[in-house]
Amino acid sequence: MKNVYYVGSGELTFDLIERIINENLKLELAPEAKERIQKCRDYLVKKTAESAEPLYGITTGFGSLCSKSISPDELGTLQENLIKSHACSVGEEIRPVIIKLMMLLKAHALSLGHSGVQVITVQRILDFFNNDVMPIVYDRGSLGASGDLAPLANLFLPLIGVGDVYYKGKKREAISVLDLSLIHISEPTRRRG
């Protein structure tokens, strides 16, 4: 389809990014990207189930809590709480076009199949992009060495039904938009959704 870009189908160049944004192309996950994501996910699930050793941030806490083991039934809660605790940016709202770029770039990065996420998580990012559900992200605040943890947490809070978004030009609670747009809440599980 001409008006669709298949995320994970190849290199994402500046020219292609510009075309996706300027021509308002819809995003779909390429079949080969789904396979890569699922393969990595399957590995993570297997490793988590079979490993007697702690896996940092997956079966343990973070930072000074790295020696605290997390029970299998609390792994989803750990990931959800991580997103919530890191959503601490402040300042001015980032413009919607930048939010779209952030979603596109994160979906592309996840489509490479190196993170352990669920395919459905990446699909939800594409659903937000395609339906112009724009999470509200603020321009100040950082955590960690990369400095992107706070903005990314704000960007993806709405995937779990928390936080605010712009939808059809109005600021709304994410949970209400998820109900309206038939985009279902992603439930975080082991490692990054």
Give the positions of each predicted feature.
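Single conserved hydrophobic/aromatic residue that forms the stacking wall/gate
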Residues: 183-193
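Catalytic cores of large soluble enzymes that bind and process phosphate-bearing ligands
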Residues: 5-9, 28-36, 67-74, 90-94, ...
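Glycine-/small-residue-rich beta-strand-loop submotif within the FAD-binding core of flavoenzymes
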Residues: 11-12, 16-19, 23, 68-97, ...
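An N-terminal structural lobe/cap that precedes and organizes the functional/catalytic core
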Residues: 37, 44-81
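Anion-binding (especially nucleotide phosphate/pyrophosphate-binding) glycine-rich loop
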Residues: 45-49, 75-137
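Conserved phosphate/anionic-ligand binding catalytic regions in large, soluble enzymes, centered on
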Residues: 54-70, 139-159
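Structural motif
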Residues: 26, 53-56, 101, 134-135, ...
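N- or domain-start disorder-to-order transition segments that initiate the globular core
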Residues: 1-52
